Amino acid sequence: MATDRAATGSGRRTGRAGLVERLPPVSFFGVSAVFHYLGPSLAVLLFAHVGVLGVAWLRIASAAVVFGCWRSPWRLWQRLDISQRRVLVGLGVVLAAMNSLFYLACDRLPLSTVGAIEFLGTVALATLGARTHRNALALALAVGGVFVLTDLRITGEPLGFVFAFGNCVLFMLYVILGHHIATTPIAPIQDAPRRDPMSGIDQLGASMLIAALAATPIGVAAAVPALTHPWWLAWGVGVGVCSSVIPYVTDQLAMARLPRATFALMLALLPAMATVIGLVVLGQVPGWRDLLGIALVVCGVALHHDGVPARDEQRRPG
């Protein structure tokens, strides 16, 4: 019976891995891009009822509960060595600080400005990976498109820019650490496939639990109003699912099969996706400037050549 159960579990994991591998990584990135803006829009509306740091804590804590129920990441934690645990602790602290600073910035600056500043860190990562003239041109087109789309204006509360640039640095660290766990498999359990696409998600779940612990001292007090108001609490849980579960999971599935520089460059699609969502959901018709920006970003991403597969990139020196 035990053998049959193990074989059944192995078969399910193999089938799941096969399904994920058959889907193109860009499809996972597309899902992440949509929710990257849907989540913050819900959060900003909740600021009128719950403190900013309280909303950040609700986002992180609700995501941690979802990952805990879904993936039971404490089982993974028991199998990790000290160096692997350090990476997950680092990612957890980054997630807690990044989400908090992001909302503090959004409370003081337009979302488009915060998003444009956030993209600067990924530009640096994409630049490090632009080892050919073709990729350098692709990067220039994407950056130019983002500049046209966002029309960044340095106006607003100075403290907001401090938070925004802090979030920029932390978002860059999220991409680095997130890509690391996506492409560095943990020793599999018995009869598990060697390349289980859920390995990175399990590690992400452990980091999210750590993030919830790290954010609790600074955010739980501000979240108390939501804990006594069912509608606001449900709203906060929705923010967590839309902002820290769906996009982070799909990020992991995309990162596992894309080089880090390629993933960083594809993040240039986020402002373009925001324009598309504005047209479809809000009826905001884009002008010529928006269409030009989208065209530049799409051309840049299409021109980029991966060169090195994500898993091979991990084995390359340096």
Residue ranges of each PLM-predicted region?
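Transmembrane alpha-helices of multi-pass small-molecule transport proteins
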Residues: A2-R5, G9, P25, H49-A97, ...
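Specific alpha-helical transmembrane segments that line the substrate/conduction pathway
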Residues: G54-A64, L95, F102-R131, N167, ...
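Membrane-interface helix-cap regions at the ends of transmembrane helices
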Residues: G15, L42, H49, A63-D81, ...
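Hydrophobic alpha-helical transmembrane segments of multi-pass membrane transport proteins
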Residues: V31-L38, L42, W70, V89-L104, ...
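C-terminal-most transmembrane helix of multi-pass membrane proteins
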Residues: A2-R12, I60, A268-G318
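Helix-helix packing/entry segments at the starts of transmembrane helices
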Residues: L58, V114-L120, G178-P185, Q190-A212, ...
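Hydrophobic transmembrane alpha-helices of multi-pass small-molecule transport proteins
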Residues: A6, L120, A124-T127, H133-R153, ...
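Glycine-/small-residue-enriched transmembrane alpha-helix faces in small-molecule transporters
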Residues: M1-W57, G90-V93, A97-L101, A140, ...
